[in-house]
């Protein structure tokens, strides 16, 4: 956000994808926002989407989040954005919140990891994105005698865990575009030091009630441990609200940001 010469500032949303996804997953939502006169930007993190970097050589969260950090650092003076993070992309949002506090007017977590900087995540959240079945396949970029460097959901589980309420066309699209996520990038996402200034930025949590990957109990625990200023529930959404309920999600985003203008 931010304007020149007294002009009304244009609200600017920046979207951060979750594991294996990319900027492409926000296409429905950004279309709605752009048509309504807002500005939207979707970021491909390192090794995701159309990034040319192999996720197996992404070593930490700083490298993974570099495209997001570059975008924020290049914003004009006094220009602020609303960050929206999905799934484990919530960790990227929180890290950006700590590093670029003065560039962010609101942080929105969509079925996302939301851990307070300086806190220790609850043991109940240790398997936050893992189902009971063996739903993941791993890549070993440094050899099978070393820890895995990448992870991707097995094709037969994609619809159930990611897109159970989403249109089949979006499931088909996603199955062609998902990429292995860099495991090492996620190891330090929730290990940020305390940051009192970041705590002052309004946060919003949007729950997904029919989520087979990130269940309501875990989402509720995140909200309880670090209460946001606003909480919304998408009753008919699977893990990927940008596909299953884009118009409702659009309405909730507008409702959330309306509080900034009061």
Swiss-Prot record:
Its EC number is 3.1.1.-. The active site is at residues 87, 211, 239. It holds the Pfam family Abhydrolase_6. Signal peptide: none annotated. It catalyses: methyl (indol-3-yl)acetate + H2O = (indol-3-yl)acetate + methanol + H(+); methyl (-)-jasmonate + H2O = jasmonate + methanol + H(+); primary fluorescent dioxobilin-type chlorophyll catabolite + H2O = O13(4)-desmethyl pFDCC + methanol + H(+). It is found in: Cytoplasm. Keywords: Chlorophyll catabolism, Cytoplasm, Hydrolase. PROSITE patterns: LIPASE_SER. GO terms for biological process: chlorophyll a catabolic process; chlorophyll catabolic process; leaf senescence; oxylipin biosynthetic process. Its main location: cytoplasm. GO terms for molecular function: hydrolase activity, acting on ester bonds; methyl indole-3-acetate esterase activity; methyl jasmonate esterase activity; pheophorbidase activity; primary fluorescent dioxobilin-type chlorophyll catabolite methylesterase activity; protein homodimerization activity. It comes from the Eukaryota. Disruption phenotype: Accumulation of fluorescent chlorophyll catabolites (FCC) during senescence. No effect on root length when grown in presence of exogenous MeIAA. GO terms for cellular component: cytoplasm. SUPFAM superfamilies: alpha/beta-Hydrolases (SSF53474). Pathway: Plant hormone biosynthesis; Lipid metabolism; oxylipin biosynthesis; Porphyrin-containing compound metabolism; chlorophyll degradation. Belongs to the AB hydrolase superfamily. Methylesterase family. Involved in the chlorophyll breakdown by its action in fluorescent chlorophyll catabolites (FCCs) demethylation. Demethylates the C13(2)-carboxymethyl group present at the isocyclic ring of chlorophyll. Uses primary fluorescent dioxobilin-type chlorophyll catabolite (pFDCC) as substrate to produce O13(4)-desmethyl pFDCC. Also able to catalyze pheophorbides in vitro. Methylesterase shown to have carboxylesterase activity, methyl indole-3-acetic acid (MeIAA) esterase activity and methyl jasmonate (MeJA) esterase activity in vitro. This is pFDCC methylesterase MES16.
């Amino acid at each position: 956000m931010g304007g020149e010469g007294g002009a009304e500032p244009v609200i600017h949303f920046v979207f951060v994808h979750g594991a294996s996804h990319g900027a492409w997953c926000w296409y429905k939502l950004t279309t709605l926002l752009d048509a309504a006169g807002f500005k939207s930007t979707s970021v491909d993190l390192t090794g995701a989407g159309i990034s040319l970097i192999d996720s197996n050589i992404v070593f930490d969260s700083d490298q993974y989040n570099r495209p997001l950090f570059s975008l924020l650092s290049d914003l004009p003076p006094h220009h602020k954005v609303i960050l929206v993070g999905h799934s484990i992309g919530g960790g990227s949002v929180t890290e950006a919140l700590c590093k670029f506090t003065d560039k962010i007017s609101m942080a929105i977590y969509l079925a996302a990891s939301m851990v307070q900087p300086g806190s220790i995540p609850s043991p109940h959240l240790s398997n936050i994105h893992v189902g009971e079945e063996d739903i993941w396949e791993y890549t070993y970029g440094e050899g099978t005698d070393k820890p895995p460097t990448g992870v991707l959901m097995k094709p037969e589980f994609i619809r159930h865990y990611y897109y159970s309420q989403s249109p089949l066309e979006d499931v088909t699209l996603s199955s062609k575009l998902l990429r292995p996520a860099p495991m090492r990038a996620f190891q330090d996402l929730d290990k940020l030091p305390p940051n009192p200034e970041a705590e002052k930025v309004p946060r919003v949590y949007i729950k997904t009630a029919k989520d087979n990957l990130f269940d309501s109990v875990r989402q509720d625990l995140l909200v309880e441990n670090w209460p946001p200023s606003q909480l919304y529930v998408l009753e008919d959404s699977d893990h990927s609200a940008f596909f299953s309920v884009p118009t409702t999600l659009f309405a909730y985003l507008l409702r959330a940001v309306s509080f900034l203008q009061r």
